[in-house]
From Swiss-Prot:
Pathway: Cofactor biosynthesis; NAD(+) biosynthesis; quinolinate from iminoaspartate: step 1/1. GO terms for molecular function: 4 iron, 4 sulfur cluster binding; metal ion binding; quinolinate synthetase A activity. Belongs to the quinolinate synthase family. Type 2 subfamily. Keywords: 4Fe-4S, Cytoplasm, Iron, Iron-sulfur, Metal-binding, Pyridine nucleotide biosynthesis, Transferase. The gene is nadA. Signal peptide: none annotated. Iminosuccinate binds at residues 24, 41, 112-114, 129, 198-200, 215. Its cofactor is [4Fe-4S] cluster. InterPro entries: NadA (IPR003473), NadA_sf (IPR036094), Quinolinate_synth_type2 (IPR023066). This is Quinolinate synthase.
Length: 303
C-alpha cells in the first residue's frame, strides 16, 4: 500500500467512522499531515475534551491516549501503535508516588501529564510543559511534590524560587541524550542561530539557550522571531511544522540523537489499520478515571 492510497483511505474511513485524528508534534511528518489537529500535550488534551466526533484516533504514546479517554469517556479512543509507550511515564508508579506523598504530607502533588492514569489519580493536579509554571504559581501550597520529570521540575523551580519544589528522579531519555559538547559544536557551526530548547533538557543545556519552552512555544517563537537561523533542542518531529511555517528560515537539530523511538512507531499504515479495524481501543478503569479526571480538568483550565 503506497502513501497516497493510505491517505485517501484514512480520509474516507475518518468520515465513515466519525473520527478525529489527533497527532503530537513529535509524530512522523506524514502522520502530522493527515491529522485534524497537531499540537503539544496541552492542546491535544483540550481537543480530546472538546471534540464532537465519536472516535478519537490518538497518534502519540499511551499516556496521551489514556488522557483522552479520561477526558472523553463516551468516545472510542484508539491508539494506532499499541506498543508506543513512554519511559518517563513508566519511571514512577502509583505505589511509589503514594510512598513519596507520605514523606511530604504537606506538599501538593503536581504530576506532569507524561504519567500513567493511575499516577494522575493520586495527584492533585496535572500539568504540561506549556503550563507547568502557571500550575505551580496557582498552587496555594509553598511545597510542591513534582513528578516524574526532574528537569521540568528544575525549570519550574528556576522560574518560581519562592516555592520548594521536590522533584522525582525521572527524565526523558530523548532529551537526556543532549550533551554540552553538542551545544558547543552547534553554536560553533551556527554562530548566528538562536538556540531554542525544551524544559525537559538538563539545566546545563537550558542555561545556554536563548529560549526555553514547550514544543508549541518553540514552534511559535521561531515563527514570530526576526532571526533566520535556529538550533532546535527538542525531538526532531517539531521541525516539520517549523519548516512549513517558515520555509525561508534555517533549522538545525541540536543533536542527531533527538529522536523518540516511541513517537516514531506510528506510521500511516498503523493509522489506516486502526480506523479500518477499530484497533487498538484504550480503556481506563472507571474508578481510576474518575480520580484522574479532576487532575486533568484542572490542568486544561489553566492557560
Amino acid at each position: 500500500m503506497d502513501d497516497l492510497f493510505l491517505v485517501n483511505e484514512i480520509n474516507r474511513l475518518k468520515i465513515e467512522r466519525d473520527a478525529c485524528i489527533l497527532a503530537h508534534n513529535y509524530q512522523l511528518p506524514e502522520v502530522q499531515d493527515i491529522a485534524d489537529i497537531v499540537g503539544d500535550s496541552l492542546a491535544l488534551s483540550r481537543a480530546a475534551a472538546e471534540t464532537t466526533n465519536k472516535v478519537i484516533v490518538f497518534c502519540g504514546v499511551k499516556f496521551m491516549a489514556e488522557s483522552a479517554k479520561i477526558l472523553s469517556p463516551d468516545k472510542t479512543v484508539l491508539i494506532p501503535s499499541k506498543y508506543a509507550g513512554c519511559p518517563l511515564a513508566d519511571s514512577i508508579t502509583k505505589e511509589q508516588l503514594e510512598m513519596e506523598k507520605k514523606k511530604h504530607p504537606e506538599a501538593e502533588v503536581i504530576c506532569y501529564v507524561n504519567s500513567s492514569a493511575e499516577v494522575k489519580a493520586v495527584s492533585d493536579v496535572s500539568c504540561t510543559s506549556s503550563n507547568a509554571v502557571k500550575v505551580v504559581q496557582n498552587s496555594k501550597s509553598n511545597k510542591i511534590l513534582f513528578v516524574p520529570d526532574e528537569n521540568l521540575a528544575g525549570y519550574v523551580a528556576e522560574q518560581i524560587p519562592d516555592k520548594e519544589i521536590i522533584p522525582w528522579a525521572g527524565h526523558c531519555i530523548t532529551h537526556a541524550r543532549i550533551t554540552v559538547d553538542d551545544v558547543i559544536k552547534a553554536q560553533e557551526e551556527h554562530p548566528e542561530a538562536e538556540m531554542l530548547v525544551h524544559p525537559e533538557v538538563s539545566e546545563e543545556i537550558r542555561e545556554n539557550a536563548d529560549f526555553v519552552g514547550s514544543t508549541s512555544a518553540i514552534i511559535n517563537y521561531a515563527k514570530n522571531s526576526d532571526s533566520k537561523e535556529f538550533i532546535i533542542g527538542t525531538e526532531i518531529g517539531v521541525l516539520h511544522k517549523m519548516k512549513k511555517d517558515s520555509p525561508e528560515k534555517q533549522f538545525y537539530l541540536l543533536s542527531p540523537r533527538l529522536v523518540c523511538e516511541n513517537m516514531k512507531m506510528t506510521r500511516l499504515v498503523d493509522v489506516y489499520n486502526s480506523l479500518m479495524n477499530m484497533q487498538y481501543e484504550v480503556f481506563v478503569p472507571e474508578n481510576v478515571r474518575i480520580k484522574a479526571l479532576g487532575s486533568l480538568e484542572k490542568m486544561i483550565s489553566i492557560e
